[in-house]
Amino acid sequence: MAEISVADIRKLRELTGAGMSDVKKALVDNAGDFEKAKSWLREKGKAQVAKRAARSAANGLVESYLHRTDPQLPPTLGVLVELRCETDFVAKTEDFKQLARDLAQHIAAADPLYVTAEQIPNEVLEAERKIYEAAAREEGKPEQAIAKIVEGRVNGYVKSSVLLDQPWVKDGKVTIRALLDQAGASLGEKIEVGRFSRFNIRQA
């Protein structure tokens, strides 16, 4: 059996966000092969996410964040976010509370409009399509390319407007969806954003 070092376990855990016991088992079961262990964890993670998706997230907390442009002035931007989990035990953990704080600060900075793409009204998407189509024609794009250009821009609108599809402001390589999946894998529960509100005096 290949010798598994503490450094290997630590490195794989940092790369995947998986728990210590899962990381060790992945390395042992794959004879210390790093790439195979990563694939094993990815497959295991997918299975765990699928199982968690069927469970109910009936606990959690509401986190708030207030932003001041000047420490001497009252806050002009505020966020409330509802972060849900399955048990009050997880809701009380510092990791869960920190995740809620990170999400509230992300929402303040990134200004999403919806939690999921399914929440975007059809009329909003149709209005965006018309705007992008008119813009593409004004730009003189070839007629046969306009439909593809419009869909690409609509997809860009969705990614920028939907919280789960946005890149995390603290790490642009990770989406909020992936961040929640990592937290769910680490905490062993279904983690989801229920809803959020963002208030900005300057946009009122």
UniProtKB/Swiss-Prot annotation:
GO terms for molecular function: translation elongation factor activity. Keywords: Cytoplasm, Elongation factor, Protein biosynthesis. One of its GO terms (cellular component) is cytoplasm. Pfam families: EF_TS. The keyword Membrane does not apply. SUPFAM superfamilies: Elongation factor Ts (EF-Ts), dimerisation domain, UBA-like. The keyword Iron-sulfur does not apply. This is Elongation factor Ts. The gene is tsf.
